[in-house]
Each structure stands twice: as structure tokens, then as C-alpha cells.
Amino acid sequence: MNASCTLQLFANGAWCDVGSVSLLGPEAQGWRSKTYTGYSVEWAIEHGGARDAHAFACRFPVGLQAFEHPHWPVFLIDMLPQGFGREELLRRLGLSVTAGESVDWRLLLAGAGNSVGNLRVKEAASWLAANAGPLRGFTDDEVAERGDDFAEYLASHGLFVAGSSGVQGEWPKILLTRAEDGLLYLDHTLEDARAREHYIVKFGRGSNEALASILRHEAAYMALARMLGLRV
């Protein structure tokens, strides 16, 4: 397996190859493996010194100097699939859902292609595109009611993407995007030019009333965050 991955940033309306991360330690060590991170020469010359959205992170200023760490860079760890999405992606890859850190690199190369934000792993984006399935839109009611067509489509083409979206954790959740036709699509299947609104959709877990209550109250906290000036 490739011991390096290409990092892409979304800038000026397009995904740009801006640098890479290479393993210097054993892949089996997972995120604890030593790494070498650097920007491409072209990107470093064009955006030298930047710590804004043109950088991997604010503590990784753009430049020609490389970064060596005793583990993965933190921004890369943040893109590693976790929780429910990790389990679904492991199944998709034919691996045990209890697999530990030794499969972290394989998960990254398949599961960091549709992260929230402007940073992604190019190899993971390519893997996701090859496994995306047919483009299909759904009405709000079909999503809310979890109709048969939506549930079947999601099981075949969507749940494993939860691990690559950055909306991770133990709750089943996915990213949906509304297109110009008013329908909702799995975010990774819709081209950027058609996107109008973006949503995080979280599903309930079984018939546990306590968990259902937690889910219902999240809307109130979102409204409170909006009142406080947060963009939610």
C-alpha cells in the first residue's frame, strides 16, 4: 500500500493538490506512526507564509520547510473515520469492525475524501468516487420518513460515507445537499455547481426513548447557538 497520501485544499472554486504526508514509521502503528508532511513547491511559492484557509492548519504555515512528527499531523487524525462511520467503512473494505489502529492508514486512504471543510485526501476522494453508486435525489418526506427506497439506497451507497464526512461519532448520521431541483442528495454524489444548501442528518437509534429525547433537544441547542452568533 502507498506510504504517502496527497492533500488537497478547496481554493478558488476547485480542489488543488497542495502537499503530502508520508509515513516514516510502520503502517501497523496507525496514527502513532512517525510522519513527514510538506507543501508542494508550487503551492509554497504562491502562498508562502499563509496560515489561513490556504494552509493545512494554522500551525502548519505554508512554506518550503517540511514538518516531521512522532505521529500523524493532528489535522490528519481529525479526518480519520470514527464511531459508526468507521464500522460501516470497515465492513465496506472487508475488514473486521473491531480492527484497531493497524488499519488506520487504510481507512484514511478510503475514508477522508468527503470531510467537512476545505481539506481532503486525494486518494480517498478517488476511492469514494469509484464507489459512489448512481446519482439519486429524494424529497424531504422520503428522508424524514426513511422510506424504503431511501433506506435501501442509503444502505447500499451512503452509510459507509459517514466515516469520511467528519460528522462522526456513535450516532448514524450523513451529509445531504439540496440541489437546484429541490431534492436532497448524498453530499459526495452531487457536483458542487448544483449545491444550494447543506445539511447534517442524524437518525435515531432504535426505540430507546432516552436517546430519542436527546435527539429531539438538539434542535433547541442549535437555535441557541444561532442566537449566540454561531454559524450552524
Where are these regions (language model features)?
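Phosphate/dinucleotide-binding and metal-coordinating scaffold of catalytic cores
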Residues: 1-232
